[in-house]
Amino acid sequence: MRVYIIIWIILSMGFRAAAQDKLLVAGSGNPNILLLDKQTGKVEWQHALEKGEECNAVALTRKGEILYSYKRGAKLVTWDHQVVWDYKTPDKTELQSATLLQNGGVLLGICGVPAQFIELDKKGKEVNKVTLNLEVERPHSQFRQIFQLRNSNYLIPVMAKQKVLEVSRKGKIIAEHQIEGKAFSSLELPDENLLLPCGDNHCYIVIDRKTGEELKRVNALDIEGVALLFVGQILQLKLSLIHIS
């Protein structure tokens, strides 16, 4: 089984070493969520997934707890593996995305007919819900990672339709752009344009936020010494650098 690695750089760790030296990783096909030393690759901590769980999103909260999706739900756990809350989804749906909101809450993306986008507060209580018909019958083909933009809207890459949607917290479609590729994730750049990792298309692209025009494309062999295989997630680092997984 191919392993799709989704990486979040840890922002605050308290009892551990310098944040920039650690990586929190997980991915479809990987039975564990891992904390790695960035330089040596040594596993410093791991959290085992239960049988049948699939993790396509993981993040560290401001409080230092671990948030992750597991296909049939999302969990918030502590470093000693205690479950803070466990949000389960109904049958015939998939919870593929669990990401952090600007206010410290959580945004859940649930694939289904219709798809659901749910905000939870820091205690795991539902505070906002948007339902949207993505016109994709098979839940697994809908999306993977959903993020909140700086203007509080949601950015939804719809894989099966090869398009991205910007949707308000009230469920209004603000923008819709067709793209060449099945975007797995997204990154809002400092200039507000959108960087889209395109999974099995072995590339990432940058599109104009307002028009959808493709401004840049980096293909599998365009970076010297590196071959882009499944391009799952890209993070913004300092000094205009990016981290590709």
Language-model regions, residue ranges each:
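An edge-strand/N-cap motif at the start of beta-rich repeat modules
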Residues: 19-45
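Residue-level detector of Asp-centered blade-edge/turn motifs that repeat once per structural unit
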Residues: 20, 60-63, 101-103, 148-151, ...
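Conserved beta-propeller blade signature
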Residues: 23-25, 65-67, 107-108, 154-155, ...
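Short loop/turn segments immediately following the C-termini of beta-strands
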Residues: 28, 71, 111-112, 159, ...
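Short loop/turn segments that connect beta-strands within beta-propeller blades
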Residues: 38-40, 78-82, 121-124, 168-171, ...
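Surface loop/turn motifs at the tips and blade-to-blade linkers of beta-strand repeat domains
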Residues: 46-51, 87-91, 131-139, 176-180, ...
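Repeated scaffold domains used in trafficking and secretory/extracellular systems
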Residues: 53-59, 92-100, 139-146, 181-188, ...
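Conserved small/polar residues in nucleotide/adenosyl-binding loops
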Residues: 242-244
